[in-house]
From Swiss-Prot:
Name by which UniProt lists this protein: Ammonium transporter Rh type B
Any one GO molecular-function label of the UniProt entry: ammonium channel activity
Keyword Isomerase belongs to the record: no
Upper classification of the organism: Eukaryota, Metazoa, Chordata, Craniata, Vertebrata
Signal peptide per UniProt: none
Entry keyword set: Ammonia transport, Cell membrane, Cytoplasmic vesicle, Glycoprotein, Membrane, Transmembrane, Transmembrane helix, Transport
Cytoplasmic-facing ranges: 1-11, 85-87, 143-151, 198-216, 271-274, 320-340, 412-451
GO (cellular component) term, any one: cytoplasmic vesicle membrane
Species the sequence originates in: Tetraodon nigroviridis
Protein's membrane topology: Multi-pass membrane protein
Length: 451
């Protein structure tokens, strides 16, 4: 089935082996356990084993890890003939990205004695970075080769770490749930990549750029996993105690309100007042994205529900009206609609975070101001300036993401072969008659395009 241009017999093994060998060498030279992981360092100090950060952070890490490998992977299985590619390539680029992210984040966020120290929190942060890459993957789903995806991941992880360093370390931005650093960055990076990869003849594969009953059901599995674990995602690296508790609670109510808004808007905007599974699979998650920045702040359950409600409405409207405009006018072919699930809700979350930060007072936060806004607590800046920093961070994130998406890519499958597993995967024998039929169609379409 695969022709010369899509064969991976040589290219993929070479790229995978070279990348992994380089990673192993770099890990050997630069990475070591942190003091809570190292046997000698841990036992040189006087403390109870249950004080180890592992017992506080690992439950959240488990949830985040499930979101990365099952949630994101299955959410993208809605394409009728691209289930292997959705879950399989998600697995591939996530495995690479979390290793590369460990190095890049460790390098930019400070090395100790010339070494990158790793522990459970660095694992969570690497998964966060990987999540941003998978968001971008959603924008180009079905239109890229594994080599392209690994190339994109390498560039994006590096730029993610740069953006994260500028925001969190230099500016003191608060973004625990990643509305800006993860969702906005990943969405607009992916949108720029898919714009650069614009395919004028992609309509030749439009009959495969759709779902069937069982593929939508599989995608809904991803949605449910993401929905259930999103409170852990947003609260995973916040300060222990009230901060983590508050973040999970705010996310919980934002998601619930978003879901009702999604169902309502889907019925209003869809044909004959019926629900559109695309809306339910995606827009119901927008509340988790939109509350990511302000989740650890004193947003209140009431405020969280408003944010989630607005996010659901915006997301559904984006799927219904904005996505067709982006494709027809701006030539942005966003396969999974990441602009509607991650892009616009991420921007909304950044704005909500900026406003909430600007309104922060000691009367509301008390001594808790030290955890949420340490620069405000120590008098370095006032709350209004913190709000300005949050707004500036959104602009910086958008700039780096859009410019970073201008990367050189190669090895793309032909327009007639997009959204199809058979290009890169061995499919079960039961699919053989269908594949044989598609081979004839491909030949005819290729001849038409060449003429």
């Amino acid at each position: 089935m695969a022709d010369v241009s899509t064969s991976m017999r040589l290219k993929l093994p070479v790229v995978c082996f070279i990348l992994e060998i380089i990673l192993i060498i770099l890990f050997g030279a630069l990475v070591q356990y942190d003091y809570e992981t190292d046997a000698k360092e841990w036992h040189n100090q006087s403390h109870n084993d249950y004080e180890n950060d592992f017992y506080f952070r690992y439950p959240s890490f488990q949830d985040v890890h499930v979101m990365i490998f099952i949630g994101f992977g299955f959410l993208m299985t809605f394409l009728q003939k691209y289930g292997f590619g959705s879950v399989g390539f998600n697995f591939l680029i996530a495995a690479f990205s979390l290793q590369w992210a460990t190095l890049m984040q460790g390098f930019f966020h400070g090395m100790h004695g010339g070494k990158i120290h790793v522990g459970v929190e660095s694992m969570i942060n690497a998964d966060f970075c990987t999540g941003s890459v998978l968001i971008s993957f959603g924008a180009v789903l079905g239109k890229t080769s594994p080599i392209q995806l690994l190339t994109m991941a390498m560039f994006e992880v590096t730029l993610f770490a740069v953006n994260e360093f500028i925001l969190l370390s230099l500016l003191g931005t608060r973004d625990a749930g990643g509305s800006m650093t993860i969702h906005t960055f990943g969405a607009y990076f992916g949108l720029m990549v898919t714009r650069i990869l614009y395919r004028p003849h992609l309509d030749k594969s439009k009959h495969r750029n759709s779902s069937v009953y069982h593929s939508d059901l599989f995608a809904m599995i991803g949605t449910i996993y993401l929905w259930m674990f999103w409170p852990s995602f947003n609260s995973a690296i916040t300060a222990h105690g009230d901060d983590q508790h508050r973040t999970a609670l705010n996310t919980y109510y934002s998601l619930a309100a978003c879901t009702l808004a999604t169902y309502g808007m889907s019925a209003v905007t869809s044909h004959d007042g019926k629900l559109d599974m695309v809306h339910i699979q995606n827009a119901a998650l927008a509340g988790g994205v939109a509350v990511g920045t302000a989740g650890e702040m004193m947003l209140t359950p009431f405020g969280s529900m408003i944010v989630g409600f607005l996010a659901g409405i915006i997301s559904v409207l984006g799927f219904k009206f904005l996505s067709p405009i982006l494709e027809s006018k701006l030539k942005i072919q966003d396969t999974c609609g990441v602009h509607n699930l991650h892009g616009m809700p991420g921007v909304l979350g950044a704005i909500v975070g900026a406003v909430t930060a600007a309104l922060a007072t000691m009367d509301v936060y008390g001594k808790g101001m030290e955890d949420v806004f340490p620069a405000v607590a120590d008098g370095s800046i006032d709350a209004s300036k913190q709000g300005g920093v949050q707004a500036l961070s959104l602009a910086i994130t958008l700039g780096i993401a859009l410019l970073g998406g201008l990367i050189v890519v190669f090895g793309t499958p032909p327009d007639t072969l997009c959204f199809e597993d058979g290009v890169y995967w061995e499919v079960p024998e039961s699919e053989a008659p269908h594949e044989a039929q598609l081979t004839t169609v491909r030949t005819e379409e290729t001849e038409k395009l060449s003429s």
